[in-house]
Amino acid sequence: MIGLVYSVEDPAGRGIASYIVEALKPHRTTNPYAMEYYEGDGFVLAGFNEDVIYFDFLEERLPMVSEYIVLSRHSSKAGVKSYTVHHTGNYGGEALSGGRPGELGIASPRTAWLLLRLLKTYRDAYSRNEYEVSYEATHHGPTSLSKPLVFIEIGSGLDEWRNRVNHAVVGDTVIGFLRGGIRDECIPVIGIGGGHYPRKHTELALAEPVCYGHIMAKYALEYMSRVVLDKMTERSVVKPVEVIVEKKGTRQEHRSLLEEYVSEKKLSLRYI
């Protein structure tokens, strides 16, 4: 059972949810914890009052769900128009945006990869070429769930969040995923380096059957350690078999640690 979840206070998430309701006609029913609640074929759709970064309660409120997809807005100071996918977690620091310090959520590499590819398909189908399709590096909460969770987002301002075409792009992406529109398999990996929008990692995932779990952007490399790398590989529904590193922006000390780590763990290592 897939749980599609959103905040009723978020115009992007609620707009995507409304599109899915219009398209799939799920049965509206009640849930004591949800403001809006629907049941469909193989999925539930639930809207909550809380902001999505504080959705650590999902397992208590939706115990029947095996995997969560969060429908959400994305904010960017640069104003980048985007459709993005990412996993959750805090590599270090104070966890100012939900979750716990030093904790990563459970990644679902194949789900995130399928959503990324479908986003590109529907971005092109709706001629939204001004929108970037991208992974984001792992960030923010929730982090404490024992089931996998993936965010899919519209960026990056109120006009984009309210736009009905954007709701259709992301809504059709989610519907395509629910219907099994892409059945391809992929090689699970983790990513190191690159910016918050790790373009080289995204380009690789769109060109090859490699699907990313956690991605650590270059701004988070100060937190990289064996312990953190263990979390990146273990907090996933499937064990990664390769570590892919954007070489530019990583220092020799990072590369040395990674080379020792992959040798010890019998993982492949690739620089891009």
UniProtKB/Swiss-Prot annotation:
Keyword Lipid biosynthesis in annotation: no
Cofactor dependence: Zn(2+)
Pfam families: tRNA_deacylase (PF04414)
Claim: Hydrolase is one of the keywords in the record: yes
Annotated Gene3D superfamilies: AF0625-like (3.40.630.50)
Catalytic activity: a D-aminoacyl-tRNA + H2O = a tRNA + a D-alpha-amino acid + H(+); glycyl-tRNA(Ala) + H2O = tRNA(Ala) + glycine + H(+)
Enzyme category, top tier: hydrolase
UniProtKB keywords: Hydrolase, Metal-binding, Zinc
Signal peptide positions on this chain: none
Documented EC number(s): 3.1.1.96
Cofactor: binding comment: Binds 2 Zn(2+) ions per subunit.
Residue spans crossing the bilayer: none
One of the record's GO molecular function terms: D-aminoacyl-tRNA deacylase activity
GO biological process: D-amino acid catabolic process
InterPro entries on file: Deacylase_DtdA_archaea (IPR018033), DtdA (IPR007508)
Function: D-aminoacyl-tRNA deacylase with broad substrate specificity. By recycling D-aminoacyl-tRNA to D-amino acids and free tRNA molecules, this enzyme counteracts the toxicity associated with the formation of D-aminoacyl-tRNA entities in vivo.
Subunit: Monomer.
HAMAP family associated with the record: Deacylase_DtdA (MF_00562)
Family statement drawn from the similarity comment of this UniProt entry: Belongs to the DtdA deacylase family.
Protein name per UniProt: D-aminoacyl-tRNA deacylase
Species for this entry: Desulfurococcus amylolyticus (strain DSM 18924 / JCM 16383 / VKM B-2413 / 1221n)
